[in-house]
Amino acid sequence: MTLYDEDNINLIKDDLRYLKLLSTKYHNIPSACSEIINLQAILNLPKGTEHFISDIHGEYESFTHMLKNASGVIKRKLDDIFGTSLMDKDKDSLATLIYYPKEKLEILKESNNDLEEWYKVTLYRLIQVCKSVSSKYTRSKVRKALPKNFSYIIEELLNEQADRVNKQEYYSGIINTIVDIGCADSLIIEISKVIQKLVVDRLHIIGDIYDRGPGAEIIMDALMDHHSMDIQWGNHDILWMGAASGSKACTANVLRISLRYANLSTVEDGYGINLLPLATFAMKYYGNDPCESFIPKALDKMLDESDKNLYAKMHKAISIIQFKLEGQKIKRHPEFKLENMLLLDKINFDDGTITFEGSTYKLNDTNLPTIDPKNPYKLTKEESELIEKLQGSFLNSEKLQKHIRFMYSIGSLYLVYNSNLLFHGCIPLNEDSSFRTLNICNKEYSGKSLLDLFDKYAREAYYYKDDDNVKNYAMDMMWYLWCGPISPLFGKHKMTTFERYFIDDKKTHKEIKDPYYTYRDSEELCNRIFEEFQLDLEKSHIINGHIPVKTKNGESPVMANGKLLVIDGGFCKAYQPQTGIAGYTLIYNSYGFLLSSHEPFESTKKAIEEEQDILSSTVILENSVTRKRVMDTDIGKELKEQIKNLKKLLVAYRKGLIQENI
């Protein structure tokens, strides 16, 4: 910028109100100059490491470990730093200490005869690791990541060289004193946490924190403690968000899925939702019903027969309520075009059959005591009272509401970040690969505008208070996001939940995937999507989750010549036999992209006691000779804008347009 160009002076005069506001922070020329120098220096630092994880499905142990080991980044750092100077078993032990410092300390202390020496060696090693992971950040940023109690000490250790002649005794003295006064344990724990924090600059969760796993609330607690992250909502997340907003249909779906997989710990223990009214209702109407199609799929859980039978009855009871509520929505919204999900009115109660789409099928279960054949979608008085109570429990769960507010505050349906497009499911397409349109309120939406519309409705469902009609419509759209054929989160032609429970003929169970999944290996499609979202065709990537990659069948997570990456995390144990692995995660550092495939995680206990890490194979997808700098990122764009404004402020000071405060 030419400082004394008259055109620039006019621009500065136009921005004078903003510049006066800026001058309250930078009072004079030296302070503005200092900040320009600082920001310009930051632009030249290597970009921070981004970590992409998807489809956690409530599996908190695997996820927590993945968060701690940063998909193998910490192990690779230890190899880079120590090479062959440390044996593999020592590096494994150090890695486990960094992941689980408090728990591992207790074990290591018991097995070391010379504890004082072990403390000193361990602290030296941890400081080396911390120096390495903090080297791409400014001192100011590192300082903010340090714990208050040990901030000064850790900063001194990070910024001094132990091998410098003049500082050897000073450095050693700090370490010796830490050990002598009994602070070594606390410092080891805090440095390990700092390493975990600095090794990844930004975490991206590409959907489905919730589902059948037992610890979604534990995962949410961990994410709320994370220093820098975002979430792209998944289909299961939307269901919980809808339930927390007050949608009865979403509430029924959440409970049905929880009962289907015998996962009541999140609902009852995590969020304090009382299911006794549902159990009482189920026993009253289905007490003598074996509910065979509703026996929970317990996977690795051990359930006694009485629990299994009770869950099956509760499962059936809430499923019937769900089908009724969904039928009411479909009839209320013909624009959703979901008439193919209206099945209760197709049942012939005399012979136990159902006729739809030109075929008649025998029902495997005809005990439907709460369905009125003349008005099948009407809730009974007791069903209505029950779903009201359950809705109230979700609305009044303090912890659930806290988690969902967080999900809204840092989440969205999609995200453009550093020239990459992140979304959970798909961009709905027609058979010819053109963007599919949805007509809402006599206006057509497709591509980006469709995702923006759904994002708007998702927020209105939770936050809108002024008009019940607006809020109710938005909540219905949340439910559509769960199961609608033009939903970017569902991505199938129809949800066949009723058919899977009540009809044995598997051809009725089929859910045809959106054409997006046929065309996503096409560079041409990816380029059209990039254009739709105004992204660089050469540099950008689409990063997806949702559909597990069946590696054992030869499927690849890298598609469209590297333009699209599928990273379903594979945390869900039910999918692991189908995929052959425990999924993929992605790392994007200053050199490029690293794709890691993972073996199943056994347990936190084994990780700590036996130092069993998640076995990962890493493939370098893109490796740049020139490291990407902060100036190449979204943050870099913001910093350049700040520098531009600060330079304007300098001119305003020098021209006397704004008075300096010396």
From Swiss-Prot:
Enzyme class, first EC level, given as a word: hydrolase
Catalytic activity entry: beta-D-fructose 1,6-bisphosphate + H2O = beta-D-fructose 6-phosphate + phosphate
EC number, UniProt record: 3.1.3.11
Gene from which the chain derives: fbp
Any one GO molecular function term: fructose 1,6-bisphosphate 1-phosphatase activity
Name used for this protein in its record: Fructose-1,6-bisphosphatase class 3
InterPro entries reported for this sequence: FBPtase_class3 (IPR009164), Metallo-depent_PP-like (IPR029052)
Translocase listed as a keyword: no
